[in-house]
């Protein structure tokens, strides 16, 4: 991985992800924000009771494409690890207070949260 890509991954920004549709097997592209917290890459979202389609797709097939866009453009094969453990979710999402979230426990219960590994 080149230095520009490493630099882009070191700070959160808007990206696209392409997952595989769990029912259709077709590629599904979605704009989303990633975060680098302590050197680890996460994708999360605002709390909602209903699971997002992209998350359900990643639960069915954790392999996806992480598309950097903007100043650095790259299509990176990646693997998602859906984080379900409440204690781990709480630890990661504690940073959300800096994003203006009022209710951490609502985030722990209802926010999508995946850790991303960029594949070699």
Whereabouts are the PLM-identified features?
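Short low-complexity stretches enriched in small and charged residues
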Residues: 1, 30-38, 67-75
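Short, structured beta-strand-loop surface elements
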Residues: 48-120
């Amino acid at each position: 991985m080149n230095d520009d890509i490493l630099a882009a991954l070191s700070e959160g920004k808007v990206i696209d992800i392409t997952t595989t549709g769990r029912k259709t097997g077709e590629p599904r592209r979605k704009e989303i924000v990633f975060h680098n917290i302590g050197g680890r890459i996460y994708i999360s979202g605002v709390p909602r009771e209903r699971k997002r389609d992209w998350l359900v797709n990643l639960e069915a097939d954790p392999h996806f494409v992480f598309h950097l866009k903007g100043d650095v453009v790259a299509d990176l094969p990646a693997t998602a690890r859906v984080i379900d453990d409440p204690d781990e979710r709480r630890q990661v999402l504690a940073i959300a207070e800096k994003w203006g979230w009022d209710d951490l426990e609502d985030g722990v219960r209802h926010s999508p949260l995946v850790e991303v590994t960029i594949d070699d």
